């Protein structure tokens, strides 16, 4: 099966291709869209079809591409690549930092000819507005709502099967609304596809990614991953004093599973601790900063004072929070069942 990467980081992509080769050896048709300079430095561990961005877009578009933010640039490139005919009708859409953590089979992405979408959020609830990623999610939400589509976020930081025809249809639909390219290719394709080509897509499934967000509790989960099948790779997590300190970033075939499990275990334990406002002394994180600093000690004292308050709130509000969570889940299941039933009606 074809897997298509965007990248401008040859070292990161080289390592990611090693992880993909080990855990997804069947994804052996590798296409990389990147600046020519990146392709020249790639030294890939697998056979790669490299497509220089400069050749895909032509000289007239280079200056415009350079002026775009990260999300707009990626959407522009993926749509242009789909139009070029360089990708298959159904391909795995990936980035250079999406790394498998365990053996993954093709059925993980396609079931009975239908693409499987892994959703991470309801965009009606996504209120962050700090990066081009956030703004692309908001624009996608507004466009999908206008077009009468669902509005789940499939920007789950893992590879997913993308239907080339549906991607181009969705891009055309938003292109009739605006000249902006600040959209999310995964989110548009899956929501638009489920509305207009439901026979090509399965029911949404929960995303299965570790390190999205980078640290647990950077924002509330809309749905928790039931397992960790992929890692959203952050190089700084492997620095001394950080969460994955001591674990190599490059894959060691003899220790791949052991290293993957060690990362999962550290991530899960940090999730449990941070949820109780307890942050390890020796691990850098967004709340305390680097370990051993004066600012970190002051922040630690602050969170220590908050822990009794949090425990009291949890006790007093336990029943209400449980009921709300159960109600929200039931409503979401009923709405999705109703929508699918309506689609199946003649």
Where are these regions (language model features)?
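Active-site-proximal specificity loops/subdomain of glycosyltransferases
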Residues: 35-86
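Conserved donor-nucleotide/metal-binding helix-loop-beta segment in metal-dependent transferases, i.e.
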Residues: 102-131
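Short beta-strand-to-loop acidic/aromatic patch adjacent to the donor-nucleotide binding site
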Residues: 88-99
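Short, well-formed alpha-helical segments that are part of the catalytic scaffolds
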Residues: 10-23
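Catalytic core and acceptor-binding pocket of nucleotide-sugar-dependent glycosyltransferases
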Residues: 135-230
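N-proximal low-complexity "stem/linker" segments adjacent to membrane-targeting elements
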Residues: 1-11
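Boundary detector for helix-to-coil junctions that initiate low-complexity/charged tails
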Residues: 97, 283-346
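PAPS-dependent sulfotransferase catalytic core
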Residues: 190-283, 288-289
């Amino acid at each position: 099966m074809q897997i298509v990467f965007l990248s401008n980081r040859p070292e990161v992509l080289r390592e990611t291709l090693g992880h993909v080769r080990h855990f997804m050896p069947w994804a052996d048709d590798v296409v990389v869209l990147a600046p020519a300079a990146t392709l020249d430095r790639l030294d890939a561990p697998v056979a790669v079809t490299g497509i220089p961005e400069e050749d895909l877009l032509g000289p007239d578009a280079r200056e415009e591409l350079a002026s775009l933010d990260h999300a707009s640039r990626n959407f522009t490139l993926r749509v242009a690549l789909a139009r070029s005919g360089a990708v298959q009708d159904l391909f795995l859409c990936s980035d250079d930092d999406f790394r498998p953590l365990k053996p993954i089979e093709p059925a993980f992405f396609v079931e009975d000819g239908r693409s499987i979408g892994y959703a991470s959020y309801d965009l009606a609830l996504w209120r962050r507005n700090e990066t081009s990623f956030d703004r692309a999610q908001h624009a996608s939400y507004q466009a999908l709502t206008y077009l009468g589509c669902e509005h789940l976020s499939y920007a789950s930081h893992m590879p997913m099967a993308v239907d080339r025809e549906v991607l181009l249809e969705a891009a055309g639909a938003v292109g009739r609304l605006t000249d902006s390219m600040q959209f999310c290719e995964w989110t548009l394709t899956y929501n638009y596809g489920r509305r207009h080509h439901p026979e090509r897509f399965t029911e949404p499934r929960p995303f299965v990614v570790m390190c999205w967000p980078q640290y647990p509790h950077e924002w509330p989960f809309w749905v928790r991953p039931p397992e960790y099948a992929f890692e959203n790779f952050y190089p700084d997590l492997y620095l001394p004093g950080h969460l994955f300190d001591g674990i190599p970033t490059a894959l060691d075939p003899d220790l791949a599973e052991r290293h993957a499990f060690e990362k999962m275990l550290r991530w899960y334990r940090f999730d449990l601790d941070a949820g109780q406002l307890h942050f390890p002394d020796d691990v850098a994180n967004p709340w305390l900063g680097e370990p051993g600093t004066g600012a970190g000690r002051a922040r630690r004292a602050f969170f220590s004072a908050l822990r009794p308050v949090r425990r009291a709130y949890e006790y007093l509000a336990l029943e209400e929070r449980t009921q709300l969570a159960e109600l929200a889940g039931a409503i979401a299941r009923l709405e999705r069942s109703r929508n699918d039933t309506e689609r199946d009606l003649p």
